[in-house]
Amino acid sequence: MMRIALFLLTNLAVMVVFGLVLSLTGIQSSSVQGLLIMALLFGFGGSFISLLMSKWMALKSVGGEVIEQPRNDMEHWLMNTVAQQSRQAGIKMPQVAIYHAPDINAFATGARRDASLVAVSTGLLQNMSRDEAEAVIAHEISHIANGDMVTMTLIQGVVNTFVIFISRILAQIAAGFMGGNRDEGEGNNGNPLIYFAVAMVLELVFGILASIITMWFSRHREFHADAGSAKLVGREKMIAALQRLKTSYEPQEATSMMAFCINGKSKSLSEMFMTHPPLDKRIEALRSGQYIK
């Protein structure tokens, strides 16, 4: 309910901003309405399609195999652990998958809390103790229980819409001035070449700025998932798991998957563009109890 309220309030704020832009620039509302519809369709369409296909795409990207029937003691333990933690978190048991990778990693995805997927790497199963692995699984279960995948989709849809809409509004203004076309009868976009070039550049720039917002939220939700894991299995187990990650291989999963994994890539120009907070910050947050309620 809180996610939907946040979504509606955000979009109300977006509409207020759009109204101010129209009032200040005097752009014809008819063209803006069409542009807004297009921005909403493209902005949210791509995000929701990705969400609906997330389980399939995730499994394909890592070559994961869903466990239909446990074949050995490790798979039995994994299924039992996920089932137990799901009951504790109050969600339906997700599908469980294993994928072959040397790095210690796991991820959760899915369009709904009760139709989700948890996948773990063979590197995690081979290199972590049972206590550490339990903590990682609890971290992913917490992502599902918190509804992080849906919330990320809503946020991504809003920022996508902003990027598309604002970049084209500004491109329309720039094309009108730079093209010297002030005659409304010749079209609202001015010189089409200038309009296209400016729109592409602005989309690139605004897209980079928008990624800072989505990455901030991604880092923020990692702290809460760590706290959720601590509540499910104990703080010390989660701290031990994060300390183990500090000695693991650099993750090999595709960049598009990093926001869903417990272990993000550490090589980044700035923490602002990282999907995960530095491991030391996550450990310190657990020790201080900052996100544990």
UniProtKB/Swiss-Prot annotation:
Enzyme class: hydrolase
GO molecular-function terms, A-Z: metalloendopeptidase activity; zinc ion binding
Organism domain of life: Bacteria
Active site: 140
Listed cofactors: Zn(2+)
GO cellular component entries: plasma membrane
EC number(s) given by UniProt: 3.4.24.-
UniProt KW Transmembrane keyword: yes
Positions annotated to bind Zn(2+): 139, 143, 222
Keyword Cell inner membrane: yes
GO annotation (BP), single: proteolysis
CDD domains the UniProt entry points to: M48B_HtpX_like (cd07335)
Recorded topology in the membrane: Multi-pass membrane protein
Parts of the chain that traverse the membrane: 4-24, 34-54, 158-178, 193-213
Cofactor-binding details, from the entry: Binds 1 zinc ion per subunit.
Subcellular location: Cell inner membrane
Alphabetical UniProt keywords: Cell inner membrane, Cell membrane, Hydrolase, Membrane, Metal-binding, Metalloprotease, Protease, Transmembrane, Transmembrane helix, Zinc
PANTHER family recorded: PROTEASE HTPX (PTHR43221:SF1)
Family recorded in the similarity comment: Belongs to the peptidase M48B family.
UniProt name for this protein: Protease HtpX
